[in-house]
């Protein structure tokens, strides 16, 4: 016996409901755009004060077949291409010798060009209806009522929603209605920083990059740099977390000299151009590498419709470039499920998305984790990873 699905009913799953997206990063904003294209009432609650808030971090590269597909569906792919910068890669050793260079061929310039995080946010914000994003909203509590969720914010009025989508990053504090899984540290640590006007402030290192991203490794210390992040040079240094840091980080990241002293000791046998980079930096950010493992199934019984996308769903080590791209695939699949009439209920649409996400999310986490293992071996070189 074939069951007939009432298509008109399905097309209106969310027609009289409102969706709350927690988090205004690229994944949350893309989700909002894709829902809005289908006439769905959606609000994004973001803790930043306003759209001018500077987002710290390196550039993002959206991949063909994943992140770019979501941008295409949103009608924003060409705008991304217009602002993104195709960049080659220089592989260097600790002495400042360029071991190999991987340049971008003209036919590959749109494969994964780099874009500044604020530029990507601006593209997405400009595509949304006015007042879609509600700024200065730090979510402190989520409570299910009889028919709607109540969202409580710090020092702001409460809101309600029929469906909640958590897109508020890897350290989300409101996952309990979806899963009891906890974020785990992987055993490596990252120190990041920006240098403005690098051509003036660290000319030796800037010239070493020569317009390309630069990667170097030596005895378990990794350095990544992008000399062109909207006029700033962004770099990151990664290493295995020292044993004495297991309970408490032994470097005070509020004290610049404390970080500089630590890094100069770690880089004592590196070329002076790398030390120039460290000496020039005015402030540093330190972060343990973390993962939100997709090992246990999420809760099948939830009081009201709720799910997670992006890092909130599958935070992973940043060693395969899969994080934001997997998150944009989340937005693409979930928005399609909610709007295309295939499912009888919001819960069914969410369940199907999560089943798909667990497959590609696990694969991305496994690739990132395997890269992390390989990259922190003493004899690792970026040449073996990038095949250059």
Curated annotation (Swiss-Prot):
Effect on the protein upon substituting residue 235 to Y: E.coli is more resistant to MCN, decreased affinity for MCN, slightly decreased affinity for NADPH, increased growth rate in E.coli
Amino-acid positions noted as binding substrate in the UniProt annotation, renumbered to this chain: 192, 213
GO terms of biological process kind: response to antibiotic
EC number of this enzyme: 1.14.13.231
Impact after mutating residue 371 to I: E.coli is more resistant to MCN, 2-fold increased affinity for MCN, slightly increased affinity for NADPH, increased growth rate in E.coli
Positions with a binding annotation for NADPH: 54
Binding site residues for FAD: 26-27, 45-48, 61, 117, 139, 311, 321-324
Pfam family, one: FAD_binding_3
Gene Ontology MF terms in the entry: FAD binding; monooxygenase activity
Main subcellular location of this protein, as a coarse class: cytoplasm
A Gene Ontology cellular-component term: cytoplasm
Catalysis performed (reactions): a tetracycline + NADPH + O2 + H(+) = an 11a-hydroxytetracycline + NADP(+) + H2O; tetracycline + NADPH + O2 + H(+) = 11a-hydroxytetracycline + NADP(+) + H2O; tigecycline + NADPH + O2 + H(+) = 11a-hydroxytigecycline + NADP(+) + H2O; oxytetracycline + NADPH + O2 + H(+) = 11a-hydroxy-oxytetracycline + NADP(+) + H2O
Recorded effect of pH on activity: Optimum pH is 8.5.
Cofactor note: Binds 1 FAD per subunit, which helps bind the antibiotic substrate.
Swiss-Prot/TrEMBL keywords: Antibiotic resistance, Cytoplasm, FAD, Flavoprotein, Monooxygenase, NADP, Nucleotide-binding, Oxidoreductase, Transposable element
Regulation acting on activity, per entry: Anhydrotetracycline, a poor substrate, prevents tetracycline degradation in vitro.
Entry's localization field: Cytoplasm
Assembly, per entry: Monomer.
Note: Encoded in a conjugative transposon. Immediately upstream of this gene is an N-terminally truncated tetX1 gene that is inactive. Tetracycline antibiotics bind to the ribosomal acceptor site (A-site), preventing binding of the aminoacyl-tRNA to the A-site. The hydrophilic side of tetracycline makes many hydrogen-bonding interactions with oxygen atoms of the ribosome's phosphate backbone.
Family: Belongs to the aromatic-ring hydroxylase family. TetX subfamily.
Domain-level remarks: Consists of an N-terminal FAD-binding domain with a Rossman fold and a C-terminal substrate-binding domain.
Function: An FAD-requiring monooxygenase active on tetracycline antibiotic derivatives, which leads to their inactivation. Hydroxylates carbon 11a of oxytetracycline and tigecycline. Acts on many tetracycline analogs (chlorotetracycline, demeclocycline, doxycycline, minocycline, oxytetracyclinee), probably by monooxygenization. Tigecycline, a new generation tetracycline antibiotic, is rendered less effective against E.coli by this monooxygenation, is much weaker at inhibiting translation in vitro and binds Mg(2+) considerably less well. Expression in E.coli BW25113 reduces its growth rate about 5%.
HAMAP family membership: TetX_monooxygenase
Protein name as it appears in the record: Flavin-dependent monooxygenase
Species for this entry: Bacteroides thetaiotaomicron
Underlying gene: tetX2
